[in-house]
Design a protein with these regions (language model features):
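Solvent-exposed, non-transmembrane regions of integral membrane proteins
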Residues: 1-466
Length: 466
């Protein structure tokens, strides 16, 4: 889980760097190296879910072992893709001779994994079978299958240029449309299962339980869809995503509310304090729900990408361009010199509904000692509703006037907030249960009396564990 947390944080920071530094207006371009970081995250996330089936029911042991093997191998494959130069990427290193060593290491590791599996196969037999399609076990199984399909799709698209060159002699690349066409439906299905899973019981879920548990979340989905429709977010995939986000959010709220209500009735604490106590008594379960809440925020931000707008214009001093409710006016331009770079800076006044809001200062920098390597400094005005993202894209070759490229990206900030919640939820899940800590503390002390009743640690731990 610690490794998964760092992987999640790395992916999020990489996306933020691409957004704030590269100046292309986006945060994820399905670049081969970006994909390489996503592959082990997908299999690792699948393992974190399916290992709960092994813990609770003694199922999917072989599957879990191979998920661990594949996650490690995909980490090495990602390093190979980045360091060998076999794929074209803005993040990749130059061509080197280290590639064959990585291939050899991957083959040796795969052989060791297979031998270890064969030798221990008898210890990996499932202790139970699937009792019902409508059960939490089925939810985890479908969840894992979707993660596996997503991993295969991303891996195939990433390596397709390499295979096409081997077999046809020409390198054929697949772009973002290919990945989006496959990954958007898979992502929505995973989001749906994120909400459904907590509502299902182990072994089998009765019809009465389904009616009782699904009513409010479905109502929340309809309300969320109606609100986003009224606000003008009407693209089909995005509207469905907002509805699913409402559904998942309400399932999380219900899980906290039901548990907190019981604690409040027993202790007299407020619901908020009871929810905190609930989370501390079972950190793994409720830390997972916090992670799911973070994923809801991320999906809200991703859905906003369907409504991105941009405009590019060659501008003279005093010229203006309009983007959504914003008007951008080029007031002036200046140059500055620092120790290791020189920069051309545009000074742009931003008006909203004809009212002055702020000044933005996008730059184009040239760094000394790097063969005139240039870099873009983006100017961003960010709110929960949208980002105004302004880039000085260079000079028009014919007129020598500055070219300004402005983007209006809705809901991007929700992605970064979601990433923070994912990390916080993981840290909560890594903490020991409060009740378990008390038991361990008591166990380290001598008994007060030989006739004192013994405290059964296993019972106490089960009370605080999902």
């Amino acid at each position: 889980m610690i490794a998964w947390c760092f992987q999640s944080l790395g992916i999020m920071l990489g996306a933020h760097w691409a957004y704030a530094v590269l100046g292309w207006g986006g945060y994820w371009g399905w670049d081969p190296v970006e994909n390489a970081s996503l592959l082990p995250w997908l299999t690792g996330t699948a393992f974190l879910h399916s290992v709960m089936m092994q813990e609770k029911r003694g199922m999917m042991k072989v599957w879990n072992v191979w998920l661990v093997f594949c996650t490690f191998l995909l980490c090495i494959l990602g390093t190979f893709l980045t360091r060998s130069g076999i794929v074209s990427s803005v993040h990749a290193f130059a061509n080197s001779q280290i590639g064959p060593w990585f291939v050899g290491f991957i083959l040796v590791t795969l052989t060791v994994c297979f031998v270890a599996y064969v030798k221990n196969h008898d210890y990996l037999k499932s202790e139970n079978r699937l009792d019902s399609v409508v059960s939490r076990e089925s939810g985890f199984l479908f969840n894992n299958l979707l993660f596996l399909v997503a991993c295969i799709a991303v891996l195939s698209g990433t390596l397709f240029p390499v295979f096409s060159e081997w077999f046809s002699g020409s390198r054929i690349s697949v772009g973002a449309p290919f990945f989006n066409k496959i990954m958007i439906p898979i992502g929505l299905a995973l989001l749906f299962l994120t909400g459904v899973g907590p509502l299902l019981a182990w072994r089998k879920t009765s019809g009465e339980s389904l009616k009782r548990n699904f009513g409010w979340p479905l109502l929340a989905a309809l309300v969320g869809g109606l609100i986003t429709f009224v606000l003008g977010y009407r693209a089909a995939y995005s509207l469905f995503c907002f509805m699913l986000c409402g559904f998942v959010f309400w399932t999380i709220v219900l899980e906290f509310y039901r548990g907190a209500k019981v604690i409040a009735a027993r202790t007299g604490m407020s619901l908020i304090m009871s929810a905190h106590e609930l989370a501390m008594r079972n950190t793994r379960r409720y830390g997972g729900y916090v992670v799911h809440f973070g994923m809801v925020l991320i999906f809200i931000g991703l859905a906003g990408a369907s409504f991105n707008k941009d405009v590019q214009q060659t501008m003279n001093l005093g010229d203006s361009m309009r983007l959504g409710t914003y008007t951008l006016v080029l007031q002036s331009a200046d140059a500055k010199a620092e120790k290791n770079y020189t920069a051309d800076r545009m000074i742009i006044e931003v008006l909203k509904d004809n009212k002055e809001m702020m000044m933005l200062y996008p730059e184009k920098r040239k760094f000394a000692g790097t063969a005139e390597q240039s870099g873009t400094m983006v100017a961003i005005y960010s709110t929960l509703r949208e980002d105004l993202y302004v880039v000085f894209a260079g000079q028009d070759p014919e007129t020598n006037l500055p070219v300004i490229h402005a983007f209006l990206n809705p809901l991007v900030k929700w992605i970064w907030l979601g990433g923070v919640w994912v990390v916080m939820g993981t840290l909560l899940a890594l903490m020991p249960n409060r009740r378990a800590a008390l038991v361990l503390s008591d166990a380290s002390q001598p008994a007060a009396s030989p006739v004192a009743p013994a405290l059964n640690p296993s019972i106490t731990l089960r009370e605080g564990h999902d």
